[in-house]
Amino acid sequence: MACAPEHSARPSLRWVRRAPRGISPDEKQPRLGVLGGTFNPVTHAHLALAATAAREFSLGEVLFTLPAVLPHRAPEEATLEQRLVLLETALEPHDRFSLAVCSHGLLLEMAQALASEYPETVKVYFLVGSDAGERILLWNYPDAEKTLAEMFARFDLIVASRAGQLSIPHQPRLEPYRRQIHPLELPAECQAISATVVRERLRAGEAIDELVPPEVAAAIRRSGLYRR
C-alpha cells in the first residue's frame, strides 16, 4: 500500500454498507478507522484488527475500503464484486463497520476521498499491518518530506505487529510524526491468519473454518471460489 496520488480525477467513495451505529455529524470528537485492502478473501485477522483498533483507540466507526483499481496488481481468484459480497456478509453482525469502494488505490487518495464523506472534525486512523506500515514510511516518494507532511496532516497510522512492538526507522524525515504512528497488538490466535493461507488451503481441499467467519466459509463453498 503506497501513497502518492497519480490520478487527475477526484478520489471518491462508492458506498456498499453504512454502519448502523457509525459516526454521526453531531459528534464532537469523532474517530474513524480505515482498513484498506483487497480482502481476497476477508479473514478473522481483518475483523480482529478492526475490532481491536476500535476498542483500543475509541474509534466510533471502522470503514473497510477496497480500491476499484489496484495500483500494483489485481487478484486473479475473485472479482471485486465477489470480494465485496464476502466482505459485506462478514460485516453484517458489526454495527460500527462500514464498507465502500474507493475510486483510487493509494493511501493519500483514499484519505482525500474521505473528506467529502465525513465531518471536518473527524480524526482519521489508517489501520495497516507491519509490512504495509514499513512500505508507507520508507517509500521512495518523489518529494518525501512534502508527501509525508500531507499524509500525516490527514491521518494517523495504527500499525498491527506481533507482541505490539513497532520499530520506527531512525530517519530525519520521520521524526516529526513519531507520535502519530501507533503500535497495536493483534490477538495471538489471529497473528498467523492471512488471506494467502486461506487460498492455499482451499486449493488443497482443506478446511478454512477457523480462518474466516462461518458465513464467509459457507459462501465460498457455495461459489467454488479459490479452488483452482
Regions found by a protein language model. Name each.
Residues M1-R228:
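Nucleotidyltransferase catalytic core that binds NTPs
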